[in-house]
């Protein structure tokens, strides 16, 4: 998913590049979760940005000792569809790009869906923090992530 808030020409280039390598890119809109749910139920691999809240309606998590907002989408999709939720972190090395996958984050047995999504999203943040501390230069963040730091 991506936001088409980019200038039209830049968004088209972004879209064209990803589609040429076999990706289906979904714009962020009201049908996105329904489309993603259908793809998940049909066994498709879905990659979602999980370290930045583009919707401004994210879940508050503890990240490096400060409150940050992460998107609810990855955990919500897993709760609603039963799809496996895995984290991935990209590291750039002299020998190329390495992608580190974490073990599955399971849907908690207890709590309502909102509590389950919050707990799973905090686990995503915890795993991301662990990798971020190893190689902070590999994190490309252009948005404000910690509101309390000004």
Task: Please place each PLM-identified region on the residue numbering.
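A conserved, positively charged/aromatic
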Residues: 18-19
């Amino acid at each position: 998913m991506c936001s088409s808030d980019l200038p039209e020409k830049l968004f088209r280039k972004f879209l064209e590049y990803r589609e040429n390598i076999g990706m289906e890119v979904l714009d962020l809109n009201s049908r996105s979760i329904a489309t993603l749910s259908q793809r998940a139920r049909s066994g498709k691999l879905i990659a979602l940005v999980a370290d930045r809240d583009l919707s401004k309606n994210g879940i508050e998590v503890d990240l490096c000792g400060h409150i940050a907002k992460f998107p609810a989408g990855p955990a919500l999709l897993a709760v609603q569809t039963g799809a496996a939720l895995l984290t991935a972190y990209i590291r750039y090395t002299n020998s190329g790009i390495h992608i580190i996958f974490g073990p599955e984050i399971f849907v908690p047995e207890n709590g309502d869906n909102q509590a389950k999504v919050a707990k799973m999203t905090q686990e995503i943040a915890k795993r991301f923090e662990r990798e971020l501390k190893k190689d902070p230069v590999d994190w490309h963040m252009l948005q404000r992530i910690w509101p309390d730091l000004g």
